[in-house]
Regions:
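A short, Lys/Arg-rich alpha-helix, primarily the initiator
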Residues: 1-20
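Short, charged recognition helix plus adjacent turn
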Residues: 63-78
Length: 78
């Protein structure tokens, strides 16, 4: 399961990327911004690209993969 390494919503707030900026710039949709603030990683690659641009980071700086029990079971069946 992919997880954020830190609170990305807070990081966006720190750099001044508000809901208003999301709406007016079109860089991130408001729905995507809501997902990010809820720590939902089910966002598009385009959104991850935008986060990297806004926060001046690489994807590996944003996300980490932690294997769940379900994923372990699925992997064993391969």
């Amino acid at each position: 399961m992919l997880k954020y390494k830190f609170n990305v919503g807070d990081a966006l707030d720190r750099v001044g990327f508000t809901s208003y900026k999301a709406k007016t710039s079109g860089i991130l949709s408001q729905d995507t911004l809501k997902k990010i603030k809820k720590e939902d990683t089910n966002i598009s690659l385009k959104a991850i690209n935008s986060l990297c641009m806004i926060l001046d980071m690489q994807p590996k700086d944003l996300l980490i993969y932690e294997e769940t029990d379900t994923e372990k079971e699925q992997k064993e069946k391969l």
